[in-house]
Amino acid sequence: MPEEVHHGEEEVETFAFQAEIAQLMSLIINTFYSNKEIFLRELISNASDALDKIRYESLTDPSKLDSGKELKIDIIPNPQERTLTLVDTGIGMTKADLINNLGTIAKSGTKAFMEALQAGADISMIGQFGVGFYSAYLVAEKVVVITKHNDDEQYAWESSAGGSFTVRADHGEPIGRGTKVILHLKEDQTEYLEERRVKEVVKKHSQFIGYPITLYLEKEREKEISDDEAEEEKGEKEEEDKEDEEKPKIEDVGSDEEDDSGKDKKKKTKKIKEKYIDQEELNKTKPIWTRNPDDITQEEYGEFYKSLTNDWEDHLAVKHFSVEGQLEFRALLFIPRRAPFDLFENKKKKNNIKLYVRRVFIMDSCDELIPEYLNFIRGVVDSEDLPLNISREMLQQSKILKVIRKNIVKKCLELFSELAEDKENYKKFYEAFSKNLKLGIHEDSTNRRRLSELLRYHTSQSGDEMTSLSEYVSRMKETQKSIYYITGESKEQVANSAFVERVRKRGFEVVYMTEPIDEYCVQQLKEFDGKSLVSVTKEGLELPEDEEEKKKMEESKAKFENLCKLMKEILDKKVEKVTISNRLVSSPCCIVTSTYGWTANMERIMKAQALRDNSTMGYMMAKKHLEINPDHPIVETLRQKAEADKNDKAVKDLVVLLFETALLSSGFSLEDPQTHSNRIYRMIKLGLGIDEDEVTAEEPSAAVPDEIPPLEGDEDASRMEEVD
C-alpha cells in the first residue's frame, strides 16, 4: 500500500486558494455539514462521478478503458501512517483540471451550482471535486491527491489548507488511470481508520453507489508451520501474502509433514501470526430501484426491504415506479406489516424515506418529501435533478421536491387502492394504519375524496365485518338522502345508544365511528359521493317521513308543549331548549348537541387533553338540547303530573333526575356526580319505603344538600310507583 508521495527533482508549483474558495470551505463546513462523516460520502460520490464520466466516454471510444478495464472504488485505511486513502479508476484529471478544480477557479457555492444545473450543465462534472471535496478537511490536516488522466501525465496535488496548495508531476507508483485521495487524518479523527466505522458510514451514505466499493484491511491470522520452515517463512512472507490473500497454507504444511513422517516422526510444528490483506466489498446490495420492476422478484424486494429497514418481517405491499420527462426520479415504496410503536410520537423523525441524488444518500428525514400522515411508508427516492450539496433550507424552497412529493402521494394512494382489492391483506393494513388515513382526510384536502374511499367502518348492518362508505351508499334506501353516523367509545356502546333507536327501527343503516380520530375526520369529511354525513347525536336529524308521521309529530308537539316549557324552566341554563324527539323509541329522553358544537364523544376527548385551551372549551361545549320521547310512559305520566300541579316538587326532582340520567346515557359526564348520587339514593329509599326523616347514627345529616328539593311524602311515593 504505497501511499508516500515521492519527491524527485521535479518542479513544485505553489498556488494560492482564491478568497472565494476559502469562503466556500467555511460555508460547506459550517452550514451544510455538521456531521464530519459526510466527507466519505462526498469523496465516494466524486469517485462515482469520475467513473460515470469514463464509462460514458468509453461507450463511444472503448479504447479509453485500455488504461484499466475495471471500474471500482477502493478504501485503504493505514493506522501506522494515520492515513485514509480512496482510489478510483475514473476519468482522472489533467494538470489543468487539477489546478482549476481544486483551488484557483472559485465557484460561488450553491447558487452557481443551481444556475449551472438550470443552464443544462453536465451534472456529473459539477460534483467532481467541486464543492464536496473540501469537506475532507473536516477530518484531515493534509490532503494529497494523485491523479492520472488518459491525456496527461500523473500529477500530485497537496495542501494543508493554509491558503495555498502545490502541484507537481508525480513519479511514484503509477495508478494507470483515475484518482487517489490520501487523507492525513487529524489526531482526534482516527475513528475513520477503524473497520467498523468505515463500514457504518459507507452503509449509511453510499450503500447504493453503482460501482463496487472495496475495503482493504491489513489483518493477522495464525499459521501452523514446522520449525525448519520458520526461517524460510520469514523470507517468503511477503510473496505468500500476495499469492494467497484469503487462505492460509495449512494444507501445504500438513502435506509436508506427511511426506517427512517416515524420516522424522517427531518433527515439531509451531503457530506463527502472519499478516494478510483482507478485501471486502461494502456495497453488495445494488440499487434495486434502478432496475426494471419486471425483472425483480418478490424475494429480492423482500431482501432489499429488510436491508433498508432492519425489519424482521416481510413488507405488506410495494410500489416501484419511475417518473420521466421534465423531471426524472425513481422511487421504491413499501408498506410495513405493522405500525411502529412510536408512529405518532412528536420527537420521532417525521418520515422513513431515504432521499438519494443520483444514487448518493442525502438525508432520511426530509419533511418536505412526504406528508406526515404517510410517515409509515418506508423506501427510497432517487432524484436525477436535485443538486448533490442541497441543504435542508433549500429543500424547503425546492419546486422539484414539491413535484416529487405530489407524485409520491399519488402513487401511495394507488398502492392503497390496489391493496384494498385483497381483503385479507387490506384488513391487516387497516388495523395498523387506519389512523393515518383519517389524519390524511383531516389534513389533505386535495386527496380527501380518494382517501375517503379507503375508509372502513362497522355499521348497524355489517355484522363483524367492516364496510366501505361506497358499499354503504350502494345499500341506501331510495328515500334516504344522507349517510347516518354515530361517534362513541366502542361498537357495543354506540350500537345500544338511544340515538340510533329510531334510525335503525326505520331500517336505515348507521355507521359506527369508535376511534377518537374519527371526530376530527368527520369535521372535514362533510359528504361522500354526493351524500351528506349526518350525526344522529346532533340536532336537526331529519328522517324521511310520510304525511301520517308528520301529522302525528305535530300533534305530539302540541300535546307536550307545556311540559317542554316547564322542563326548560326547571333546568334553566343547563339546556338551551327542550323539544319532542323523532329519534327515540325505547328511551324516555336524550341530550343532543348543536350542529356545529362538539358531540359528547368529542367533549370527552377534549377534556382528556392535558394542554387543552379552556377558552375554546367554553364555546365549543355548546348548550345542550334535551329531547323527550312522547311515546314513553315516563314522559306521558310526567306530563299528567305536571298538568295536575306544575309546582309539584316531585316533578322538579324527576325532571332533574331525567336530565342527569340522559346526560350519562348520551355519553356526557356530570359536573356534580355527588348530587346525582344522593338523588338516586333518595329514590332507592323511597322505593324501599324508608322514611326520609330516619337518619342513621353513622350518616351525617349534611349528606343531603339543602339545594335538593325534598320529595313529598307517601302520596308521592305511590305516584313514583305509578311511573315505574
UniProtKB/Swiss-Prot annotation:
Residues 225-244 have a biased composition (Acidic residues). Glycans are attached at S434, S452. Residues 2-214 are annotated as: Interaction with BIRC2. It is found in: Cytoplasm; Melanosome; Nucleus; Secreted. The modification Phosphothreonine is found at T297, T479. Residues 222-270, 694-724 are annotated as: Disordered. Keywords: Acetylation, ATP-binding, Cell membrane, Chaperone, Cytoplasm, Glycoprotein, Membrane, Methylation, Nucleotide-binding, Nucleus, Phosphoprotein, S-nitrosylation, Secreted, Stress response, Ubl conjugation. ATP binds at N46, D88, K107, F133, R392. One of its GO terms (biological process) is regulation of cell cycle. The record marks I126, G127 as: Cleaved under oxidative stress. Residues 215-552 are annotated as: Interaction with AHSA1. Residues 9-231, 264-608 are annotated as: Interaction with NR3C1. It comes from the Eukaryota. ISGylated. The modification N6-malonyllysine is found at K399. One of its GO terms (molecular function) is DNA polymerase binding. The modification S-nitrosocysteine is found at C590. Gene3D superfamilies: 3.30.230.80, 3.40.50.11260, Heat shock protein 90, C-terminal domain, Histidine kinase-like ATPase, C-terminal domain. A motif (TPR repeat-binding) lies at residues 720-724. The modification N6-acetyllysine is found at K435, K481, K624. The modification N6-methylated lysine is found at K531, K574. The TPR repeat-binding motif mediates interaction with TPR repeat-containing proteins. Monomer. Homodimer. Forms a complex with CDK6 and CDC37. Interacts with UNC45A; binding to UNC45A involves 2 UNC45A monomers per HSP90AB1 dimer. Interacts with CHORDC1. Interacts with DNAJC7. Interacts with FKBP4. May interact with NWD1. Interacts with SGTA. Interacts with HSF1 in an ATP-dependent manner. Interacts with MET; the interaction suppresses MET kinase activity. Interacts with ERBB2 in an ATP-dependent manner; the interaction suppresses ERBB2 kinase activity. Interacts with HIF1A, KEAP1 and RHOBTB2. Interacts with STUB1 and SMAD3. Interacts with XPO1 and AHSA1. Interacts with BIRC2. HAMAP family: HSP90. Molecular chaperone that promotes the maturation, structural maintenance and proper regulation of specific target proteins involved for instance in cell cycle control and signal transduction. Undergoes a functional cycle linked to its ATPase activity. This cycle probably induces conformational changes in the client proteins, thereby causing their activation. Interacts dynamically with various co-chaperones that modulate its substrate recognition, ATPase cycle and chaperone function. This is Heat shock protein HSP 90-beta.
